[in-house]
């Protein structure tokens, strides 16, 4: 039965209400969303021929070269009363290539080829020049432009470039099989170099991909790819939505990066920013046709007070075409395997999450504060992507806890595959910042790690790029602080602070990995406890690149202790590949002992034991388990190669006893030293 047929039934109850009966009082609001979604799908089918044609807007709009070398340029600019294409090819003469406007506000010009060669040369500058109803002449970068560059000797504003290389990129590798357990390596191309400068696509391909593969991750999430004028915005102030950042290299060099990753078996996800747009006028979408409301809501509704940016009007036909086509473009042109949607909370609520604390009450998700246009756009985006690309992965960044965010659209959900577990890193930072180790509450830790919605998959992480930014601290820095500058060498004594830091860094990440979700994420460098924070060049730091880089040299130096954390992270990822606990059912926690600071649980045919006690080790400690038989150590955080003390004899096997313990049918007895975690495999 199709969603349309189901919704038409008077007594139809959305599937989400069967999954979570507490949602039944809100069924009318859920059905209203589905009605709105159904209406959009029907109109797209009737007027555009369905998702497939509608989402190929980049083949109709912007500059497109025909097989005979002719160029057709189309632009939606309903407020303009005149328009022309200008550029180096016609000496910026507004009279040479005037455009014609149709009844939908779309401007068009046909530029014949010369002897089969496009009139506009490859890699030359262009603009659209328009006249407003008030008679003002305005020049803009084409909204669908695929490449923009910056010449700081001339202007801070970016230039639109007609990009039509004579040799197209030849793809070598097919996309890999969709991973059943998702282990994401979050990365930023520009900071991925030791040196104090902007890194390149080619450097990332040649130097970083092999690190990611060796560590055992199976997916990469690339940040700051969509073109953004301000480097320090971390890519979140997008100016050209169809352009990829030229500061890292050419489009073909990004294609090579993705192609090479695919050859290594790595999925590549794009951090897509559809939650807002840069307010730049000269090189952005703001005031594109001279009006305040071309792509955005008008007035205050179209502005994000905290981000100082513009907000899309998701309910407009051409805006919807633009955004859905943007997603399709990156799938087709660059062969990305999916998206991490940024700022989903802002898209789903009129208040954008500003000054709002979510209590978890369901009225917060279905009342007047919800922006139905934004929610329905996300439903359409996920529906389109999953219908056209069944192997795609979509991830949402939402702090509100919206029910159904990761349930199918036809069930009344919003259609994402995963949501980020944003409460987990907040918990770890709060513990390290505010509590002594003796005061850590094992029950609260386990509750936060397992507090996720039924049948909605979650990506767990102990820290991401958010915690690395200036003004915050990474886990390693919270744990070891200034001693990272003086005592991370194996040639110096192992101080109590460094010893504690290494131990807890491993345990925090392992517990998060094992208990926190159905996927895992790490921000580049954090796997080895990257020193210092992340700060992009800006006026406030004298435009310094010192903190806008990754110090790979410290993990490559055998004399430094960073290598221990790196080796542990590698072992952890490869163990997950072997046992697949992320794709296993949620763990059964048999032990949360506050006084002893012990946690034990079963997941993925593995028995996990954590001793967070600062000083107390336990001999012959009874650990309950459902499985009878022999156990052996699969992972031990206390190994010397991980910076531990080798206090455990790993040649020993553990045999279960058939007596109930901690609610399990059997138990084993283990030696578990302080600040050590063990993962035991069941033979």
Curated annotation (Swiss-Prot):
Record's keyword terms, sorted: Cytoplasm, Glycogen biosynthesis, Glycosyltransferase, Transferase
Active site positions: 342 (nucleophile), 397 (proton donor)
The EC number(s) this enzyme carries: 2.4.1.18
Metabolic or biological pathway, per its Swiss-Prot or TrEMBL entry: Glycan biosynthesis; glycogen biosynthesis
Catalytic reaction equation(s): Transfers a segment of a (1->4)-alpha-D-glucan chain to a primary hydroxy group in a similar glucan chain
Alphabetical GO biological process terms: glycogen biosynthetic process
Annotated compartments: Cytoplasm
Database matches in CDD domains: AmyAc_bac_euk_BE (cd11321), E_set_GBE_euk_N (cd02854)
A GO term for molecular function: 1,4-alpha-glucan branching enzyme activity
Annotated site (Transition state stabilizer): 466
Chain sites annotated for binding (1,4-alpha-D-glucosyl)n: 92, 127
Enzyme class: transferase
Function: Glycogen-branching enzyme participates in the glycogen biosynthetic process along with glycogenin and glycogen synthase. Generates alpha-1,6-glucosidic branches from alpha-1,4-linked glucose chains, to increase solubility of the glycogen polymer.
Family assignment from sequence similarity: Belongs to the glycosyl hydrolase 13 family. GlgB subfamily.
Protein name per UniProt: 1,4-alpha-glucan-branching enzyme
Organism annotation: Rhizophagus irregularis (strain DAOM 181602 / DAOM 197198 / MUCL 43194) (Arbuscular mycorrhizal fungus)
């Amino acid at each position: 039965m199709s969603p349309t047929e189901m919704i038409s039934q008077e007594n139809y109850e959305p599937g989400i209400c069967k999954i979570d009966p507490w949602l039944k009082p809100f069924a009318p609001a859920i059905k209203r969303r589905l009605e709105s979604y159904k209406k959009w799908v029907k109109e797209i089918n009737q007027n555009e021929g369905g998702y497939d044609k509608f989402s190929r807007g980049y083949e109709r709009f912007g500059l497109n070269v025909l097989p005979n070398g002719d160029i057709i340029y189309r632009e939606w600019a309903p407020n303009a009363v005149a328009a022309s294409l200008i550029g180096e090819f016609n000496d910026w003469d507004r009279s040479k290539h005037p455009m014609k406007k149709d009844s939908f506000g779309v401007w068009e010009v046909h530029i014949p080829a010369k002897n089969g060669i496009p009139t506009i040369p490859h890699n030359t500058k262009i603009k659209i020049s328009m006249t407003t109803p008030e008679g003002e002449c305005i020049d803009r970068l084409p909204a669908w432009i695929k490449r923009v560059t910056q010449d700081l000797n001339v202007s801070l504003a970016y230039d639109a470039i007609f990009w039509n290389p004579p040799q197209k990129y030849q793809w070598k590798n097919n996309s890999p099989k969709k991973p059943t357990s998702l282990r994401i390596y979050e990365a930023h191309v520009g900071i991925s170099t030791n040196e104090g400068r902007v890194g390149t696509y080619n450097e990332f391909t040649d130097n970083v991909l092999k690190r990611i593969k060796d560590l055992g991750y199976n997916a990469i999430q690339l940040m700051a790819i969509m073109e953004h004028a301000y480097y320090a915005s971390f890519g979140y102030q997008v100016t050209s939505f169809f352009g990829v950042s030229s500061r890292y290299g050419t489009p073909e060099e990004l294609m090579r990066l993705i192609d090479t990753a695919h050859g290594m078996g790595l999925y590549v996800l794009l951090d897509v920013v559809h939650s807002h747009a840069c307010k730049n006028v000269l090189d952005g979408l703001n005031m594109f046709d001279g009006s305040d409301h071309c792509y955005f809501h008008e007035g205050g509704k179209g502005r994000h007070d905290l981000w100082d940016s513009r907000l899309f009007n998701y309910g407009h036909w051409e805006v919807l075409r633009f955004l859905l086509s943007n997603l399709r473009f990156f799938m087709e042109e660059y062969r990305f395997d999916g998206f991490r949607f940024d700022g989903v909370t802002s898209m789903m609520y009129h208040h954008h999450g500003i000054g709002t604390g979510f209590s978890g009450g369901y009225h917060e998700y279905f009342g007047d504060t919800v922006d139905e246009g934004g929610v329905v756009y996300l439903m359409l985006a996920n529906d389109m992507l999953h219908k056209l690309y069944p192997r795609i992965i979509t991830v949402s960044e939402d702090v509100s806890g919206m029910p159904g965010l990761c349930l199918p659209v036809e069930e009344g959900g919003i259609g994402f595959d995963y949501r980020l577990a944003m409460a987990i890193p907040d918990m770890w930072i709060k513990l390290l910042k505010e509590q002594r180790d003796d005061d850590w509450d094992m029950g609260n830790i386990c509750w936060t790690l397992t507090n996720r919605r039924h049948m909605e998959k979650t990506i767990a992480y102990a820290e991401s790029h958010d915690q690395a930014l200036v003004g915050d601290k990474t886990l390693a820095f919270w744990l070891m602080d200034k001693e990272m500058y003086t005592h991370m060498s194996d040639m110096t004594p192992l101080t109590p602070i460094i010893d504690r830091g290494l131990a807890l860094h491993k345990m925090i990440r392992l517990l998060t990995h094992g208990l926190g979700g159905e996927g895992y994420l790490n921000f580049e460098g954090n796997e080895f406890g990257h020193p210092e924070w992340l700060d992009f060049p800006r006026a406030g730091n004298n435009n310094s690149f010192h903190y806008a880089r990754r110090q790979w040299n410290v993990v490559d130096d055998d004399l430094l202790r960073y290598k221990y954390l790196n080796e542990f992270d590698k072992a952890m990822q490869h163990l997950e590949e072997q046992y697949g606990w992320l794709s296993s059912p949620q763990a059964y926690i048999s032990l949360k002992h506050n006084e002893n600071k012990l946690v034990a649980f079963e997941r993925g045919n593995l028995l996990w034991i954590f001793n967070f006690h600062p000083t107390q080790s336990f001999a012959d400690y009874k650990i309950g388990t459902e499985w009878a038989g022999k156990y052996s150590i699969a992972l031990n955080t206390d190994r010397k190669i991980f910076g531990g003390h080798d206090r455990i004899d790993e040649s020993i096997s553990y045999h279960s006893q058939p007596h109930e313990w901690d609610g399990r049918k059997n138990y084993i007895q283990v030696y578990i030293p302080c600040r050590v975690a063990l993962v035991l495999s069941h033979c």
